[in-house]
């Protein structure tokens, strides 16, 4: 018997399942089917591993020393992932799911199930949102908390006074608390800016007097309060809280007095307009759709009454946060990830409004996006072909099966993208905007999944810091080891599951030769100093490319200078193909 449930009702109930089915391959491959990659992941893995070993889990630790840049929620969860599955990125599956479904729920409240499905696909594939969701860092948990908070804020704002409004705002506070415990102030800033901007825009000042808006603060107090109290009463707790919430927040906007290690204005420099100029890259492959959405939003935000509220909320969830980021002294692209939530909603609203009534700009955006996805698929295929050719120049036995897989994957990438894009073109001819976007998503996601499965093993070899750390650990097992001006990745890789004993030599304000020679005098002829060398080691890819363009070999940096001056000798080198290079220094020959 044919079901009596109307098709629209069926879609409303089933869009979350459809989202999970569509995005699961991207999440599983991007999160679980690769090793730990720089930047940041080796450091985050060591902090999570340390958290899984700690008896006092109040504060994160990097190589046994307090790491006071973020609150501990994401590290608690990653430590649980290590204990349960041996995988610190396992919680990212939950973060990505919460992010996609929360954005979808917001779009469903704005319009319909079709917008919910589309917005979830978009936030799952926008370059910056996808990168953050699959990366081992607190930003993934922050993004999930912000998505949850925005969903609650919209529901609370648009609901009539009573239980539904209370539930919405309570959800907002829950998401804000999760975001705060993941990465401090941005967890509060994103929903607060969106809601306050919307209230001011619509001059609905009475909303600030609603008891429902503040009742959920109890949730935040119950989540954040016990942890902050426990830290405050612990030894050195007040200094830890000052570092977490003064130097790490205010100190990223302006230079404040304090130790040099806490001067965050000295790295990741910001410059005027950085985030807005880089925004087209963050939005790939949907950049042109975002342009069309912004053009339509110009009219949408001027619609009076509830019909214009979705447009105003999407803008309020995006632009104010980017403006605040632009005022900071420090900047990193991942900081802008929460702004992708509002952009996903904006594009979904555009797709609904342009359905069956395309403008010239809409048509150009759809065609241009298909061309962009086709170009990306070609780049993926070219990269896979390059890997297959480069394998022959790695000075290792050729794995013909792996070579064949990469060539076949390159062909499959092109075929899958071409077929899906053809369906997208047909949907546009029928003025089916949502269908065109979904088919384009299929082309992009299919190409990314196929290329990822084939390419990630090669990238894992370039990023195999575990092997590098094992070799260094074995080579220095009976020798005093020092690290010369190490970065956090070096410290983390030697500590992760190995606890390689070492000391840090800091040359700030000193001469490297004086510091290193002093270490050798103090610890004898068997002592060693590890130095990160500049550039990357050669590999099959660089050897292949050097046939067409001369690639100068990287120098030895400070290690070469110390060896030339007779302060030290290079005892051994450690390197990964296309990856990091290290020199192990010993005392100069007698």
Model-assigned labels for residue ranges:
Residues 2-363, 576-581:
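Membrane-integral, polyisoprenol-dependent glycosyltransferases
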Residues 2-4, 13, 170, 296-590:
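Membrane-embedded architecture of ER/inner-membrane glycosylation machinery
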